[in-house]
């Protein structure tokens, strides 16, 4: 029986490259030169600047760098800014994996579409199985049209 997996993964090397590009862009910008920093550790980017408006500009620089490296901006979760001495700090977390709630929504969406496929939650991925490859392609089209709030990839196709 043909099947595929729905996952939400990030290419860690591309994320590192995007953060490095954002750091270079920060050094190039005249209005932000020497006023802010990016720190990247384990899918968390900590932004440090002197004021709120600089943090907002830095978030936009980071989002642009991610998009240039073909990483969907939906995976970036920006937390609230907080004061740390004279500086303002803000964290941006890169989310990866499908949590239980999103997996349930994906399964429900597949069932609502009334396709001839079955969806099963398997940890941080959803396995979709069907009798024909055409049914799986319809399921992929339905999931691409669905706005889940997370970037979805389809892999592990089996015939």
Curated annotation (Swiss-Prot):
Keywords: Nucleotide-binding. Pfam families: DUF520. One of its GO terms (molecular function) is nucleotide binding. InterPro entries: DUF520 (IPR007551), UPF0234-like_C (IPR035571), UPF0234_N (IPR035570), YajQ-like_sf (IPR036183). Disulfide bonds: none annotated. HAMAP family: YajQ. Nucleotide-binding protein. This is Nucleotide-binding protein PSPTO_4393. It comes from Pseudomonas syringae pv. tomato (strain ATCC BAA-871 / DC3000).
């Amino acid at each position: 029986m043909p099947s595929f997996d729905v996952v939400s993964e990030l290419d860690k090397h591309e994320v590192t490259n995007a953060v490095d590009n954002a750091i270079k862009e920060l050094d190039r910008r005249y209005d932000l030169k020497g006023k802010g920093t990016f720190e990247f550790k384990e899918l968390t980017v900590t932004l440090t600047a002197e004021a709120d408006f600089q943090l907002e500009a830095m978030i936009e620089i980071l989002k642009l760098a991610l998009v240039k490296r073909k990483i969907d901006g939906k995976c970036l979760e920006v937390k609230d800014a907080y004061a740390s001495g004279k500086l303002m700090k803000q964290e941006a977390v890169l989310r990866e994996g499908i949590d239980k709630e999103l997996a349930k929504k994906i399964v429900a969406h597949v069932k609502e579409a009334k396709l001839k496929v079955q969806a099963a939650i398997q940890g941080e991925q959803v396995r979709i199985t069907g009798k024909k490859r055409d049914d799986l392609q319809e399921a992929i089209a339905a999931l691409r049209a669905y706005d889940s709030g997370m970037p979805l990839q389809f892999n592990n196709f089996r015939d």
